UniProtKB/Swiss-Prot annotation:
One of its GO terms (molecular function) is ATP binding. Pathway: Amino-acid biosynthesis; L-threonine biosynthesis; L-threonine from L-aspartate: step 4/5. It comes from Haloarcula marismortui (strain ATCC 43049 / DSM 3752 / JCM 8966 / VKM B-1809). GO terms for biological process: threonine biosynthetic process. This is Homoserine kinase.
Length: 291
């Protein structure tokens, strides 16, 4: 039996819609896999009651099918579904890495990304690499149709998850189909700043690069209290704040010494709106690990 820990992720990061992603030190899914004649799935942990165990409807079932690797698979969810933290991607990433090793398929980590993305498509409806790439490879990733570029970055983060449900499909439906030229110019500049900040481990540049005037404002309307939480986090010292993935998690970049205060402030801001939330004081971390 193999055990794989695959991290939660934050995709988009404001200016990198459907392209940027980072692996988080915490939370994570833990998946145990053992060779078998057919695929069976058992799910426990956060939000497990909402996750189908039918292999045809579960992310890991699709991954097992793509790798022709039947197994008994136990998923312990540390990443809540519909959180904006790459819940389905974490399970798919763990399955891809684990089954690749269990069956000695010989794929590289980068080659496993599109395989895991097929699994995530079972939930989201489309195969996107921006969550599975960092969950498999770790660090900061840039996923395009040409492949994945990865950078080992070290940026402190605060991820605040409110007790609000925002489905990936709903979040995609509100994305604008067009953008003004000035918005695109600003987005390119912000994306360049964020990428440079990741290379330099510079929270200030990363935070500046998280600003977005196209997708984030549209999705913010689905998250009660987003603007208040964002403003409170910035006032507490965050260098940048945006929506993690499809939401509802709100993620902030910061200096190490400000992280605790920002976490407390974000919780309080959601509380003032009558919204319960939990917070992760985390940072950019590594990819899936096999034990």
């Amino acid at each position: 039996m193999l055990t794989v820990r695959a991290p939660a992720t934050s995709a988009n990061l404001g200016s990198g819609f459907d392209v940027f992603g980072v692996a988080l030190e915490r939370p994570a899914d833990v998946v145990r896999l053992e060779k078998a004649d057919r695929v069976t799935i058992d799910v426990t942990g956060a939000g497990s009651q909402y996750i189908p165990e039918d292999p045809d409807k579960n992310t890991v079932g699709a991954v097992a099918d793509a790798l022709d690797a039947p197994a008994r698979i136990q998923i312990d969810k540390g990443v809540r579904p519909a959180s904006g933290l790459g819940s389905s991607a974490a399970s798919a990433a763990a399955a891809a890495v684990g089954l690749n090793e269990l069956y000695d398929r010989g794929y590289s980590r980068e080659e496993l990304v599109p395989i895991a993305a097929k699994g995530e498509a079972v939930v989201s409806g489309d195969a996107h690499d921006d969550n599975v790439a960092p969950s498999i490879m770790g660090g900061f990733t840039i996923a395009t149709d040409k492949g994945v570029t990865q950078v080992d970055a070290d940026i402190p983060l605060v991820a605040c998850l409110p007790d609000i449900v925002v489905s990936t499909r709903d979040a995609r439906n509100v994305v604008p189909e067009t953008a003004r030229v000035d918005q695109m110019v600003e987005t390119v500049g912000n994306a360049a700043s964020l990428t440079t900040g990741m290379h330099r481990d510079d929270p200030e540049l990363v935070g500046q690069g998280m600003h977005d005037t196209v997708v984030t404002p549209a999705r913010a309307k689905l998250i009660d209290g987003y603007e208040q939480v964002r403003e409170a986090a910035l006032a507490a010292g965050a260098t940048g704040v945006t929506i993690s993935g499809a939401g509802p998690t709100v993620i902030a970049a910061c200096a190490e010494e400000d992280r605790r205060q920002i976490a407390s402030t974000m919780l309080d801001a959601f509380g003032e709106r009558g919204v319960d939330a939990r917070v992760y004081q985390t940072r950019i971390g590594g990819g899936a690990e096999v034990f």
